[in-house]
Every structure is written in structure tokens, then in C-alpha cells.
Amino acid sequence: MGVHLGLIAVVSSRDELASVMAHELSHVTQRHIARMQDQQGRTTPFLIAGMILGVLAASRSPDAAGAVMMGGTAGTVQGQLNFSRDMEREADRLGFNVHAQAGFDSQGFVGMFQKLQQASRLNDNGNYPYLRSHPLTTERIGDMQSRLGLGKTFAPVETSIEHAMMAARARALMSPYVDDMQKLTDVLEKDFSPELPLAKRASMLYAGVMAYTQQRRAAQARQTINQLLQLVREDPAGLRAAQWLAADTERRLNNPTQCLQTLGAKVVDRARVVLQTQCRLDAKQAALAAQASDAMQLWLAQHPRDAIAWDLSSQALLQTGDRLRAMRADAEFHVVRWDEVGAIDRLRAAQELAKQLSKDGKLDRAGNMEASIIDSRLRSLERLRRELLQPY
């Protein structure tokens, strides 16, 4: 499951983002797609029966035949729409409970539906609710407000500095085009003011740094990142995000050494681990590549489902010259992304490489162990693939 950058950019708080994820994950946990298919299977006989009756009626009255066929089709489609709206209400209800139990502000649900209503106000007048796959947005807002309880105020959720900066990052990453980058820098240079809210100023500076970096304007990027670091120095989460941006900016400006110095030696979380590994790989030095490989191996021992870590591990191993392990890491990257076919292809290529190395006398003890792991993983993935292809 992924999150679209546009969603991160449009929400005002992490509570609103969590409300969308809670709703969508409720669809998954309640198996709504499977239930929809089951519902369609139960209504198909009625649709076929309507068509048969229409054919039988055609000999006496063509109009009656058309009416019978259309009536059967309309009844089937209406039943599917009713079922779809019920599933949406169920996802709202269960998602609301999950959202609250996870510690998020339930007002985020109301705020997200209000944004949805605002976005569709010009092309949706609320007519024909019985012909919709989703309940009316006004109905969903009322339902969420009633669940919050009577007498509760609905003040706007305040945007945190960290969220404002991540929304700015999403906006900068959404489009790599020159004109869009120029718009971000123009907004910073023309509209930035000390009178703006702190979160807004942090957002503008963050987006400006990314735009300047994309434009290869190194001096402006470094000057802006210093402004950002000074602005958010009293907010721990915001300061951490700004420090990561400072390091990433140096990396994108082809200065991996400064990137590593900015990060420091203490690595305790995923973002810093990944960024440090990227900087080491960009340095194109054998010693740093070996350090990157060791760091990724340690991280993957505790987080084996991290696709980006597997990809970085593969790159690091290639730089150290360990092609066999690099190919297996690439295969594991495909496995985590549910691409069993791609993983099997990489493992088979690794098998061929191991055979060639063995034939040339270049496969040492560690290589033999790696070849055995590759054989075992290939067998397990091929077995999994056969199970997935079996009919129910």
C-alpha cells in the first residue's frame, strides 16, 4: 500500500492523513472486494433470468422485451450501488474507531470530509444519492460529527511544523518540471513574511530549498536551509526533518562528504540510515561502500520487509564487487514489492552466475553458502508461485 504525494500535500494534519488510511485499510480488513465479487455472483442469475424472459417476451412484444431486459439490468446495478454505499459506511465506521484507538484526533475525519466536499463543490450538487457508489459527503460529515459527540467544538486542527514541512516536500516531489520549481521559489521570494504562522514559514522555506536544489542554485539552497534550521530550532521534530533536508541537499548537490558530516555518526532511525547509505554510495569509494553494505545488512536483519533497504543493499554490494549477493538482494527487493516473477528471474540469473564462478574456480566458501541460499529461496518462491496460480 502506498500514499499518493498529492494526498500528503492537501491534508492539513497527520490526523486527516490517518483518517484516509484508516478508511482504506478498513476496506482491506473487511474484505470488501471479495464481498463485492460474491454479491455480483449472487445477482448474476437474476440478470440472466431477466434477459431470458426478455427474449421469450420478444415474440409477443418487442417493447416488453426491452423493458424486461432493462429492468433486470437496472435492478442488478442498483443492488450493486446499494451494496457499495453500505461498504463505504462500514469503512467509515470501522475506520473511525481504528483512528481513535490509534491515538489520533477524531476531528481529522470531519476535516477530511469537509475538504472532499470543498473540492467537489463545483461539479457535485448532491442530486440522485441512490445512483452513487458512495454516500453523500454531507451525510458522511454528519455521521462523523455525531460520533464525536454533542457539544464538541469543531475548531480547525492546527498544522504541526513537521507536517507542514512534509507537505512541502510532497509538493516539491510531485512535479520535476522547471516551471513548477520556479513557482515554489517565486512564492518564497515574494510572499515570505515574518508575520506568517511558523508552520507556513517552515513550509515555504522547505519547498524553497528543494526547488533551489533542483535548479542547481547551491548558494541559495544553503542559505535557505540555514534560515530553516534557525526557524525550527525549538521544535525537535521539525529540527530533525530540517537536518535531514540539509544532508539530502548536500547529496543532491554532489557533495556526499558534506552530507555524511551533516548527518553525523549517530544513526538511530530509518530515514537517517537510508540517507547515510545513499551518501556513502554516491561517494563511489570502496571503503564507504563496504560500510554501506554492512549497515544495510544490519538493518535488514531487523527489517526484512524494507524494499528500499534491499535496493540500497544491492547497490552497495555491486560497488564492493560482490555480484552474487547483489543479485540476491535485488531478488529480495522484488519479493517485498510482490513481484515474484521478477524475483524468480533474478534468482535464476544468480544461479547461472554461481555456476560460472564455480566453473572458473572463483567461488569461495562464502560464495558456496550464498549459492545454497539462492537455491533455497528460488525453490520457495517457485512453490509460492505455483500455489498462487492454482484455481480455488
Task: Pin down the residues of each PLM region.
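Short pre-active-site segment immediately N-terminal to the catalytic Zn-binding motif
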Residues: 2-19, 83-86
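Catalytic Zn2+-binding segment of zinc metalloproteases
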Residues: 15, 25-42, 60
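Extracytoplasmic and endomembrane cell-envelope/extracellular-matrix remodeling and assembly machinery
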Residues: 79, 84-268, 294
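Alpha-helical adaptor scaffolds
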Residues: 243-256, 260-320, 324, 330
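Alpha-helical linker/edge segments of TPR/alpha-solenoid repeat scaffolds
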Residues: 141-142, 154-155, 252-259, 283-292, ...
